[in-house]
Amino acid sequence: MSSEGEHNNSDLALRSRLIAELRGLRLDTRRLNSSLVERLRPFRKTDGSFKTLPDSRKKKHRKRTPDISVASTCTVLLAAITSGKYEKRHKLFETKSATEIFKQAVVKANWGSSGLEDGNAFTTAIVVRTAGFMVQRGVLPAKEVQALKHAHFKNNENVARKTLKQIVQSKAKKGEDSFAVADYPPKSTHAYWFVDGAIGAGVALPQSTWQKIASWASNEFHRQLIYVTAENDALMDPPSLAMAACLINRIRRLSDEERELASLSRMLPSLVELEVGIEQVFTKQSESGIWHRYFPLFHFPKGGGAADYCFSFEFLEAILTEFGTFVLRNPALLDRVKRVIRWCDTHELEFTDATGKKYRGWSSGGEVRSLAEGKSESWATASVHMFLTQLDRRISDLLDELVLKGFGIDRRAVTESSKKFEQMIDADLRFLGERPTTLKKVIEEEILKKAKALTAEGLIREGLPVPRSVLLFGPPGTSKSRLAKAMAEYLGWPLVTITPSEFLGKGVEHVHAQVDEKFRDLMDLRKAVVFFDEMDALAQTREGDEQSDGRGAGDLDITRQLLTTSMLPKLSSLWDQRRVIFLMATNHKQQLDPAITRPNRFDMLLCVPPPPWTSKSSAESLDGILKIPDPKKVERKLGQLAPPKSRTANRLNAFTVAEVGIFLHHLRRKTNQQTVLEALEQFTDPSEFAKAVENWAVTAITLRSQGQTIREFGKDFNESRRQYYPGEE
């Protein structure tokens, strides 16, 4: 074996091993994350907000100030929004919606966590980040969020009676001072939350402000990187290093998106430096799976010396957001992430209060007495779930990338263009549900536009709507494969083509294993078009077992068994995932196993007929698809020889586009002419051309394979179209 072949095999083995590890880790992550609502709901108070501890006492406030723990409530909101479980149907928010609770926290509540003053850097950063998530996830529009006015009664000039937009802009002007609580130094934790939220909420800041923040973040990163690398226990603060790296990367992403801020990237450490910093953070992970405490964010003014620290899961969530792929691709760091998951498994607390209400979740360890009593914290539990959700998302992103690479596809090289779809010759589907329409119109209106709208609005995480699967049937040569490619380009999604060889290449004895393997890969894809091509051999009924190609009934029984016992359930699972659009093409609709058309497999059964003669003979088709010289003159001559609605045109309606091209070149050769136009000019009488069509039609590819005359094929074709229409949810 050549060194190149050995290298490829080694890469394949490494990729397969990484895929297997990631799938296993994702299973554990989803198992832990599945109880988000059950863990957080017991902390919900009657007003819809969330208390910090099971036994949190009601705080004394003036009548017009609601008793809301803003930091805890917003952190729960962040976890719910990140996971997509913020709607009332998820039963985490029932008496009030997530948007109502957020507005109440922003407008009426005191932004003074743990005795801190209203509008302190810690609480403000959490509120602003929650606002950004609200906008980014489509929960609230940016203008509405920015216009929310903090109307708390206290006369704090920083926040009182100012809109959220004004608060963000006024605080950001102060640069790093905006991220300091009282007399404590500025913290990169507060800075990352604040900046991420401001960007997400669409609050514009001047370039000078960004330069201040970028300069401070770079200095903080380099300072902490030196301390951590030197193992200076007295000065190092790994959480601050992690958050500084995340802050810088967030600013870098902004500078890549906003042309007027492009110069910011020159002020920032390189991506390689940032990744070195992240590696250094993980070197300080304890054996338990999380990090020891270093410097506090602040001390509670009324807490008897108690302090608040950046919880490990808060900076881990930020690391995954900004450097997820880097972490998961690195075997050493991937093992560290697994250690974190083990901590989640072994450190979950359970507590039952005096009323019998049960609480499950995690504690940050900040409340020592509560930890000793086994009481979890709402915000810490929410932070763990934010980490789990982000880990799931980053694993899924990387699996999508790795699986596509296995198919020889790089998503970054995929471009979005509707040109190929627009250039496709349309086909009449007037019998479709008895409504006059066309093939392209049905596909564009029912599938492509809906999927594209969801992608544009960032709502694709909720899943693709019905219809998202199509069975394409029709004679060979009707551009079913080209249609799949055009659909993928229209959306800007990769096209993954699956043929029978993917399942049968290793022999019949390995068919089920191959089906399992390929569909595991397909289940890891998102925003992709999957095209099952040439699947007729795997979809035949017993009535179609005896074929003229010489295959025995036993062979076809095996392929039929493959479909019914392996592929069909997998198609249903792929449909349930709601992450891809998948198509299957067949030339033999009548021979399909009826099970394939059942609900939750194919939402829509569409005939892909030969386009009408007028479309096939158009200059656009002759030039763009068939590449015939002098297309306009050829179109004009064909219009004279086979005018619309003539008997000859009706015959030519049954020809595929490819067959029209073959026929025209057949005429050129038969008449010994140099061009198609010269060949057509040999026909002065339309009846002579009609006879040439009839003589050639008996050998046409489509008709020969169907074993039918033009008239018989057209009759059966029209009848079959009446039976199929778009599926409905």
Could you say what each language-model-derived stretch is?
Residues 384, 398-429:
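A short, basic N-terminal segment
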Residues 457-462, 678-729:
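C-terminal engagement/docking regions of AAA+ P-loop ATPases
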Residues 2-27, 31, 56-89, 112-143, ...:
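An alpha-helical repeat/solenoid feature that recognizes helix-turn-helix modules
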Residues 436-636:
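Walker A/P-loop NTP-binding motif of AAA+ ATPase domains
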